[in-house]
Amino acid sequence: KDGYLVEVTGCKKSCYKLGENKFCNRECKMKHRGGSYGYCYFFGCYCEGLAESTPTWPLPNKSCGKK
């Protein structure tokens, strides 16, 4: 599946260098996530080819610090 990586807080894993981004690419390709490629899009790490079990944004019942 494709999607934004998400923190336990419910926020997207943020990034600042838009487009090709080594940090996002490395995060997406971690073994437990299984992604094939990652880049920075709208200041969040977006991954392609993630394992179905990898949580992606938005998380149910988590709104990134908003109540």
Swiss-Prot record:
Localization terms from the record: Secreted
List keywords of the entry alphabetically: Amidation, Disulfide bond, Ion channel impairing toxin, Neurotoxin, Secreted, Toxin, Voltage-gated sodium channel impairing toxin
* SUPFAM superfamilies named among the record's database cross-references: Scorpion toxin-like (SSF57095)
Q: What does this protein do?
A: Beta toxins bind voltage-independently at site-4 of sodium channels (Nav) and shift the voltage of activation toward more negative potentials thereby affecting sodium channel activation and promoting spontaneous and repetitive firing.
InterPro entries, A to Z:
LCN-type_CS_alpha_beta_dom, Scorpion_toxin-like, Scorpion_toxin-like_sf, Scorpion_toxinL, Scorpion_toxinL/defensin
Propeptide position ranges: 65-67
KW Secreted (keyword) present: yes
Q: Name one Pfam family in it.
A: Toxin_3
Q: Which Gene3D superfamilies match?
A: Knottin, scorpion toxin-like
Which Gene Ontology terms cover its molecular function?
Answer: sodium channel inhibitor activity; toxin activity
Regarding tissue, the record states: Expressed by the venom gland.
One Gene Ontology cellular component: extracellular region
Domain of life of the organism in this record?
Answer: Eukaryota
| PROSITE patterns linked to this entry | LCN_CSAB
Q: Where is the LCN-type CS-alpha/beta domain?
A: 1-65
Query: Which family does the record assign?
Result: Belongs to the long (4 C-C) scorpion toxin superfamily. Sodium channel inhibitor family. Beta subfamily.
The record comments on the domains as follows:
Has the structural arrangement of an alpha-helix connected to antiparallel beta-sheets by disulfide bonds (CS-alpha/beta).
Biological process per Gene Ontology, one example term: defense response
Its recorded name reads Neurotoxin Cex10
Q: Which residue positions does Cysteine amide occur at?
A: 64
**From what organism does this protein derive?**
Centruroides exilicauda
User: Between which residues do disulfide bridges form?
Assistant: 11-64, 15-40, 24-45, 28-47
